[in-house]
């Protein structure tokens, strides 16, 4: 045997494994069988950590129940700590994220890596599985069908905590701009038509509150992930486990993760059902819808600058055209739009894969995992990208904003309590026909005085409309 290889054996025969590899023959075959993408399990450190946490919890439970030798359990626990605390072997998970087998390749990859780390800690060589075996010891009282989804759930839950932090930081960025723009009057619009005045601060605060609602929704649905089927083994009957194992393993998992994990009410149902993933990714889709809408608004509000709304200025980040000089585009809102489109597409993937299970197992969980990890990852990055490269640098064109208000026919709505709806119709029609302002027409018709208009159209009143009429002209008067 060469110093560069070691021989390992499985159901299908013997294979040469690189001597320095911590993975084994099962992982090697998975590498050879699945070459779909350039994305590996190693590229998702949260997933690796989630799987290792499951293995640590299982080893702790097995140690307490004496289902494996104490020295072996201690070696597995120590191997898990090497990965969790020191990042050891995070590059030893080379299996493609797209894979058949319901996650068996990921589970065995984890078993092999931990077994070989444990063997070294015990003073043995990699591959000397007679002392510490990937199946008989690391995978004791487990099946891929409970270990894999439990590790996946822990990993997604951990990732969602980071996403929530990113959303909150973005929300705070909008809130800061809301305060900065609180006294800037602008025209509100419905159906892209002038409606009634508001402040730019109110518009940005609405963005902030919108994101606050999404945080609550994500946190609420994320709790579904903490109901796990650890101890279910193959189909949920708990085959080859002591009756005490499942609740004890889940208790140990809660200790290892720091999350309030609980056993599923029915392990057979939990092993076959993927409804929690549909719910959680649905929350991600809802966030994507809201973020995309915000970016649409930012692009529209900054449009122009000469022939658009031009109410706000986005930071100028790069030249916008290879042919048109001096053109700058809203590239960050555009990329966030695209992120949101991808997340919405991933939601369809999760939905179809969750529906595709048969009988006691859904073998499509790997693609659910790929979609969910990708969605959480790109949404997290999008929040920071939008905050740092766009929101923090937004400035307002106060004169433009206020000019739209005072030149708009829409502000005649504010005069309804003072001049009546019918007179408002007449004023609006004259403004549209002549191009005159509402103020000009109202004064010409003697409906209100300069002083009254100054009071009604003050920033304070437009921000907080007072409906108690100081003067009212009956609609019958002409």
Curated annotation (Swiss-Prot):
Record-stated family: Belongs to the class-II fumarase/aspartase family. Aspartase subfamily.
Catalytic activity as recorded in UniProt: L-aspartate = fumarate + NH4(+)
Ranges where the record places region SS loop: 320-329
Record annotation: effect of changing residue 143 to G: 9-fold decrease in kcat. 4-fold increase in KM for L-aspartate
Regulation of its function: Under nitrogen-limiting conditions, activity is regulated by a central regulator of nitrogen metabolism, GlnB, which interacts with AspA and stimulates its L-aspartate deaminase activity, but not the reverse amination reaction. AspA exists in a pH-dependent equilibrium between a higher pH form that has an absolute requirement for a divalent metal ion and for substrate activation, and a low pH form that does not require activation by either substrate or metal ions.
Gene3D superfamilies, per database record: Fumarase/aspartase (C-terminal domain) (1.10.40.30), Fumarase/aspartase (Central domain) (1.20.200.10), Fumarase/aspartase (N-terminal domain) (1.10.275.10)
Organism: Escherichia coli (strain K12)
Name of the featured protein: Aspartate ammonia-lyase
